[in-house]
Amino acid sequence: MIDQYKHQQLRIGLVSPQQISAWATKILPNGEIVGEVTKPYTFHYKTNKPEKDGLFCERIFGPIKSGICACGNFRIIGDETEEPKFCEQCAVEFVDSRIRRYQMGYIKLACPVTHVWYLKRLPSYIANFLDKPLKELEGLVYCDFAFARPIAKKPTFLRLRGLFEYEIQSWKYSIPLFFTTQGFDTFRNREISTGASTIREQLADLDLRTILDSSLSEWKEGPTGNEWEDRKVRRRKDFLVRRMELAKHFIRTNIEPEWMVLCLLPVLPPELRPIIQIDGGKLMSSDINELYRRVIYRNNTLTDLLTTSRSTPGELVMCQEKLVQEAVDTLLDNGIRGQPMRDGHNKVYKSFSDVIEGKEGRFRETLLGKRVDYSGRSVIVVGPSLSLHRCGLPREIAIELFQTFVIRGLIRQDLASNIGVAKSKIRENEPIVWEILQEVMRGHPVLLNRAPTLHRLGIQAFQPTLVEGRAICLHPLVCKGFNADFDGDQMAVHVPLSLEAQAEARLLMFSHMNLLSPAIGDPISVPTQDMLIGLYVLTSGNRRGICANRYNPWSRKNYKNEKWNDHNYKYMKEPFFCNSYDAIGAYRQKRINLDSPLWLRWQLDHRVVASREAPIEVHYESLGTYHEIYGNYLIVRSVKKEIIFIYIRTTVGHISFYREIEEAIQGFYRACSYGT
C-alpha cells in the first residue's frame, strides 16, 4: 500500500468476500471469468506443466515464463501492437512472469468457515462480540451441538429450546426417523442452526453502535455492596471495556464483524509457496501446498454431498462441514486446536502462521531484516571514555563502510590515479588511507540499530571514531534506549548516503538529542547495571566509622606512620589535603586507596557548622589552636574560638564523583547560555 506521501506500508486486517474476489478474478476476452481454484493438483506428472484450474494454473496466476503461454506461443511484453493479450487456445495472459509473485486465487467454500485467529486466539474476538463463552462457540462451530432458532418470530418445533447439546442421545436418532431424508434437510434448515453459518448470521445481525451504547450503560452501573458480587461486576466491566475497544476499532476501520467468517479462502501466489526440483529429479514442495490440497479435497467432497443432498444423510453433511473447518484451521494455524497435522515422516506441517511469525518468519527475516549495502554488524562493548554522541567503529568495519568515500578522497588528492590503485592502497593499509578515513568519518554520522526495533530509540545516530579490535564501542548511557547490555549483544551499523538522510540523522536521531522516553517522557539516559555498581564502589567509602578507623590496626594499611617529605603532608591518623588536586595526585601515586578516608579543606557555610552537634574529640595544639572533630567534618579554631579552617571527611571516590558532576553542570549551563 502507498499512501498520499508515497510511503510504502503493509497493513494486515479483515477484508470482505467481494474484495477477495476482486483480488483474484480476471475476465478473459471471451468473457470467461477465472480466478477460482477448483482442483487440488499442481503439475502434470508427464508434461511437468501446471494443471488447469489447479494450485499453479497459468490462467489464474500468470505464465511461468515471461511472454510465453501454456501452448508455447510467444508475445513481446509491453508491445501495444501485439494482439491479442491472451492466448486464444489456453487463455493464458502474455505478461511478465513476476505476476506470479502477487497474483492471487481463491477457493469458494461450500460452507462458511470461521477464521481460527479470531475464534481461538486470546482474546477471542468472536466470543467478545457475541458475549458467549468460547467453549460454547467452539462446540457450535465444529457441529458438536446446535441452535434452535425461530423463523419470523413463529414458534418452532423445538419450543425455543435454545442452545441444546445432544445430551439426550435419542435426539440424534429420533429426528431422522420422524422425517424422511428430504424432510430432515428441510427441518434442519428451518429449525436447527449449526456450524460457522450460525456464527455468521449472528455477527451479521450485530449493530456495533448498539453494542457500544449498551456496554457503556452497563459499565456505568455502580457496585452492589456484596463483595462476591462486586468481584463479578469488576470482571464483567473489564470484559465490557475490551468489547467497547474492539467495537470502536471495527467502526473506525470500516470492518464488518461477519468478515471473521470466511466464504472465500484466498490462495497465495505460487511464487510464495514454490515447488522446487532438486537433485535426482525429485520435487520439494512448500507445506502450504499440501494444506491447500487438503482443503480443496474436503471442500469438493462437501460440494458433491450438497448437490446430492436429497440422498445424503444430514449427519454426513455436518461431519463433512466439520472436516472442512478443520482443514482451513490447519492451513491458517496448524496445531492451534491441539495435535498438529504431520506428514509421512512425522514432521509437522508449517502453516501460514508458522511462515509469517517468529524470528525466521516472513516479516522479521524478509521484510524487516533484509540485508542492505553500506551496513555492517558486530558485538558491542562498553566505551566509557566516549562522549554520549560518539561510537567506536573497528578499523575493519569502517574501511569497508566508507571505502567509496576513501577512494574518492585518494583520487581527489592525486594520491591514486584510478580506482584500482586506490583499492590497492587500501589493501596495503597505507597510513594516508587512515588519515583520509578519519577526515571522511569526521563529517559523516552512522546509524546504530539493535533488533528488535520496538520503538523510536531502537535506532540512533552517532559520530564514529576509529578504535582497535573488532567490536563496536558504545557509551553505556545509551544502552537503555536500545534495550542492550554488554553480554554478547550485536548491533548493526548503517551509513546514511543522501543529504536528506544525513540531515535527519544529525537533527533528529543523534543520541544526545534523545534523552527522554518518547512513550512516557521519563529520562532514558540513566545509569544502569555496571554503572550503578561502579558508582556504588566509587562513593561507598570505608563505613566502619571514625573511631574504628582510628583505633583498628587492620584499617591502617592506607596511611602508614611515616612523613611524606616530598609533599610536606603532616600525618594525623587520616591525611589532610588542602585541595582536591593534591588528594587525587596522592591516589595516582598509590599513597592512598580509592576508599581511604581523608580530610579535605572545604568552603562550608558557617550556618551549617553552627549546630548543636557535640564534637567527638577535641585536639589542642601548643600554640592554643585546637581541632574539633565531628562525624563528617573537622573545624580548626584559633585561641579566640574563631574558625580558621574547615575540613570535610571524604574519600577520593567522592571527590572524583563530585568533580564529574560539577563539570557536567557547568557544561550544561554553558550550552544553555550559548543557545540563548
Swiss-Prot record:
GO terms for cellular component: chloroplast; DNA-directed RNA polymerase complex; mitochondrion
Catalytic activity: RNA(n) + a ribonucleoside 5'-triphosphate = RNA(n+1) + diphosphate
Residues noted as binding Mg(2+) in the record, renumbered to the chain: D485, D487, D489
Cofactors demanded by this protein: Mg(2+); Zn(2+)
Record keywords: Chloroplast, DNA-directed RNA polymerase, Magnesium, Metal-binding, Nucleotidyltransferase, Plastid, Transcription, Transferase, Zinc
Location relative to the cell: Plastid, Chloroplast
Nucleotidyltransferase found in the keyword field: yes
GO terms for MF: DNA binding; DNA-directed RNA polymerase activity; magnesium ion binding; zinc ion binding
InterPro entries, A to Z: DNA-dir_RpoC_beta_prime, RNA_pol_asu, RNA_pol_N, RNA_pol_Rpb1_1, RNA_pol_Rpb1_3_sf, RNA_pol_Rpb1_clamp_domain, RNApol_RpoC1
GO biological process terms, semicolon-separated: DNA-templated transcription
Origin: domain of life: Eukaryota
Transferase is among the record's keywords: yes
Cofactor note: Binds 1 Mg(2+) ion per subunit. Binds 1 Zn(2+) ion per subunit.
EC class of the enzyme, as a word: transferase
UniProt cross-references to Pfam families, sorted A to Z: RNA_pol_Rpb1_1, RNA_pol_Rpb1_2
Amino-acid positions noted as binding Zn(2+) in the UniProt annotation, renumbered to this chain: C69, C71, C87, C90
Protein EC: 2.7.7.6
Protein function: DNA-dependent RNA polymerase catalyzes the transcription of DNA into RNA using the four ribonucleoside triphosphates as substrates.
Summary of subunit composition and partner proteins: In plastids the minimal PEP RNA polymerase catalytic core is composed of four subunits: alpha, beta, beta', and beta''. When a (nuclear-encoded) sigma factor is associated with the core the holoenzyme is formed, which can initiate transcription.
Family to which this protein belongs: Belongs to the RNA polymerase beta' chain family. RpoC1 subfamily.
Name assigned to this protein: DNA-directed RNA polymerase subunit beta'
Gene: rpoC1
